[in-house]
């Protein structure tokens, strides 16, 4: 049944001139039918540059929205509309406006993991891989960073000349990991294990890392390192790409499972491609304002 569905998806892709984009955290079978696998920034960039008319975005809602904002003339379909990012929903447009009123001299930087409405009222977006560079390149010394307090504190550590005002948002998958989890894992797997940590983790976890970086950064580090054993401290879906690129290395994961990222399935991909349903729609006014923040990220 699964093989049959995969064949049908491949056929439909050609018929409908569609490209399938899947985030590293997606289920293995979804990654297997994708044309491109990557982090949110890479996938949104691919969607903007690809020749296909239709983008099937397998991730969570903010990613599909961002793809639509930067590719307004393409049809963006989202297999499972209920797959939202809880962190993105921890702040509203109204919250941002109140922060701006309270800190009128501050520039507002939002993590790409935020809604289209929030993106429409900030100065610039960033990703976990370019956040430090973006903040350093802003002229203002006062920066409101939202919604992720953990990534925000990591930025503050690496931009000491800036004052970072944080929002109390977090990724529930990364935020639950504590230093004791890392210590326990090292006791189990050996102190020689390389600990690779996503910056959405708490400071106490980052302090025990051998490397801190985005999902793509973690994959690149493992690929280029001579070490053979790694503890991967991010969502478990990234293991598929790590094993594919490094078959001779050992990877160990913590219990880090994003149920929202796992909502997409090849059945939903097939259904939305077949029926052209679940198209991403964004208010034109919001889209016009949000695109400025995303485009400024490219310029910085």
Curated annotation (Swiss-Prot):
Q: Where in the cell is it found?
A: Cytoplasm
Main EC class of this protein? transferase
Mind listing the UniProt keywords for this protein, alphabetically? 4Fe-4S, Cytoplasm, Iron, Iron-sulfur, Metal-binding, Pyridine nucleotide biosynthesis, Transferase
The cofactor(s) it depends on are: [4Fe-4S] cluster
Please list the reactions this protein catalyses: iminosuccinate + dihydroxyacetone phosphate = quinolinate + phosphate + 2 H2O + H(+)
Which E.C. number(s) belong to this protein?
2.5.1.72
Membrane-spanning parts? none
Question: To which pathway does this protein belong?
Answer: Cofactor biosynthesis; NAD(+) biosynthesis; quinolinate from iminoaspartate: step 1/1
Residues reported to bind [4Fe-4S] cluster: 85, 171, 258
**Which InterPro entries does UniProt cross-reference here?**
NadA, NadA_sf, Quinolinate_synth_type2
- List positions binding iminosuccinate: 23, 40, 111-113, 128, 198-200, 215
Report the co-factor binding details. Answer: Binds 1 [4Fe-4S] cluster per subunit.
Q: Which domain of life is it from?
A: Bacteria
What Gene Ontology molecular-function terms does this entry list?
A: 4 iron, 4 sulfur cluster binding; metal ion binding; quinolinate synthetase A activity
Q: Which GO terms describe its biological process?
A: 'de novo' NAD biosynthetic process from L-aspartate
Provide one Gene Ontology cellular component: cytosol
Give a short account of what the protein does: Catalyzes the condensation of iminoaspartate with dihydroxyacetone phosphate to form quinolinate.
Protein family: Belongs to the quinolinate synthase family. Type 2 subfamily.
NCBIfam families per UniProt: nadA (TIGR00550), PRK09375.1-2 (NF006878)
Protein name (database record): Quinolinate synthase
